[in-house]
Amino acid sequence: TYHHYDMSKISDPAVFRKEMDDVRALFQETTGTEMAMYYRPPQGKYSETNLQMAKDLGYSTFFWSLAYVDWNVDAQPSHEEAFSKLTGRIHPGAVVLLHNTSKTNGEILDELLTKWEEMGYTFGKLEELVQ
């Protein structure tokens, strides 16, 4: 979503559509490519109405099963804390949420993915789950 609102409080389809359209336009402008049609409710907050609105707009909704407090740019976890939480909580079938605003995530990502591979995990794309 564009503003990352608590979408569970949005019941007006026009407001919901604008959130989705605005982020798609920004993505297109920034990357020069079309954004994939996936919806992740911010903060994991949603209503049945939201899920239906997303579906009506052609989005597939996904939730995460592994996340940690990485979104606060003013209170980033240490490398050790992040690595420990992420390796300790990984599980088969995990959908991992890592915010791109996290400096720590960027710094540990290569090491983290390597560790998960050493633990026997493989990685896939959301589109594989939709099919």
Regions found by a protein language model. Name each.
Residues 104-131:
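C-terminal domain-boundary segment and adjacent tail
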